[in-house]
């Protein structure tokens, strides 16, 4: 899995940063892409990346401010124009369905695929055999969600060396043993596949937050995450301003990462007041509290778990 930051700016686009959008690429895991927020010109950013709209399976909207949703109508239309025909699910606050449907209707846009809308409340919003996604309220004036994506533990690897040492030759029987089945061998021995499977591989945890000021719900959403993506609209000494504007500072994000025992913090949603050099200072500031911090730039790619 990898995170591709398509837009990392706050509020309005700037020369160095487009507005918010993050792609979670899971091509190896499920051959799909999940998108978190879709600010204006997200589809242009996708054209500059390796992301393919045909692989897009789900879109998660954190809140209804324009810098997080104005790119949706164009992106959905282009996906259709490019031949996308698989169904798409959009998760988000109340109003997301009306916004998308009205935009498409008034522009006379007809899609070649169906959109399923899930207007969410806190709790589990999606689960299958591979992932579970939960959402909770943040604090941003309008309803804003944070998402916690948990990859379920994977079955351990089959110990082929142990099987060979026990005189079991490679072949179709290996697949049955890998599935944990009890198998009778040609020589009459009965072996249990469970005895040859290693420890389960721990799944990854990714927490992606919408805009927010400090709030108690952040801790549970971020707890023990491999990656926490958190807004850092302001530098540390502007905590009062951040609170008034319902945003966070670098230091607040770093303190949360430390308290929640996350492995890596990625800062995004950077105000246009900070150019590239000033952004480096934001990173240095956050690292004084949480060393394993990165600051995202447009089109930056981060591997999950590295």
UniProtKB/Swiss-Prot annotation:
The reaction(s) this protein catalyses? Endonucleolytic cleavage of RNA, removing extra 3' nucleotides from tRNA precursor, generating 3' termini of tRNAs. A 3'-hydroxy group is left at the tRNA terminus and a 5'-phosphoryl group is left at the trailer molecule
Listed binding positions for Zn(2+) 1 are 63, 65, 140, 211
List the NCBIfam families hit by this protein, alphabetically: PRK00055.1-1, PRK00055.1-3, RNase_Z
Its biological purpose is as follows: Zinc phosphodiesterase, which displays some tRNA 3'-processing endonuclease activity. Probably involved in tRNA maturation, by removing a 3'-trailer from precursor tRNA.
What cofactors does the UniProt entry give for this protein? Answer: Zn(2+)
UniProt binding sites for Zn(2+) 2: 67-68, 211, 269
Q: Which InterPro entries match?
A: Metallo-B-lactamas (IPR001279), RibonucZ/Hydroxyglut_hydro (IPR036866), RNase_Z/BN (IPR013471)
The entry lists its GO molecular-function terms as:
3'-tRNA processing endoribonuclease activity; zinc ion binding
What's the subunit arrangement here? Homodimer.
Co-factor: note: Binds 2 Zn(2+) ions.
Sorted UniProt keywords: Endonuclease, Hydrolase, Metal-binding, Nuclease, tRNA processing, Zinc
**Enzyme class at the top of the EC tree:** hydrolase
The molecule here is called Ribonuclease Z
Documented EC number(s):
3.1.26.11
């Amino acid at each position: 899995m990898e995170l591709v930051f398509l837009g990392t700016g706050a509020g309005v686009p700037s020369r160095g940063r487009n507005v918010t959008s993050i792609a979670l690429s899971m091509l190896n895991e499920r051959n799909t892409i999940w998108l978190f927020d879709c600010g204006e010109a997200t589809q242009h950013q996708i054209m500059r990346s390796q992301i393919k709209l045909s692989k897009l399976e789900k879109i998660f909207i954190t809140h209804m401010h324009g810098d997080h949703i104005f790119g949706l109508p164009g992106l959905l239309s282009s996906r259709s124009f490019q031949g996308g025909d698989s169904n798409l699910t959009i998760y988000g606050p109340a109003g997301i369905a009306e916004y998308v449907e009205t935009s498409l209707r008034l522009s006379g846009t007809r899609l070649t695929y169906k959109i399923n809308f899930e207007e969410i409340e806190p709790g589990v919003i999606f689960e299958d055999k591979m992932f579970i996604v939960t959402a909770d309220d943040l604090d941003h004036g309008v309803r804003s969600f944070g998402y916690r994506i948990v990859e379920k533990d994977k079955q351990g690897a089959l110990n082929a060396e142990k099987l060979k040492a026990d005189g079991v030759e490679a072949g179709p029987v290996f697949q049955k043993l890998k599935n944990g089945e009890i198998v009778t061998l040609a020589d009459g021995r009965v072996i249990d596949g469970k005895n040859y499977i290693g420890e389960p591989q721990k799944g990854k945890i990714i927490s992606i937050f919408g805009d927010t000021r400090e709030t108690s719900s952040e801790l549970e959403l971020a707890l023990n995450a491999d990656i926490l993506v958190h807004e850092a609209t302001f530098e540390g000494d502007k905590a009062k301003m951040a609170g008034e504007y319902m945003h966070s500072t670098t230091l607040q994000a770093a303190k949360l990462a430390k308290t929640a025992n996350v492995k890596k913090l990625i800062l995004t949603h950077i105000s246009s007041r900070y150019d590239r050099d000033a952004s480096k200072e934001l990173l240095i500031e956050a690292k004084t509290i949480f060393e394993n911090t990165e600051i995202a730039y447009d089109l930056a790619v981060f591997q999950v778990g590295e």
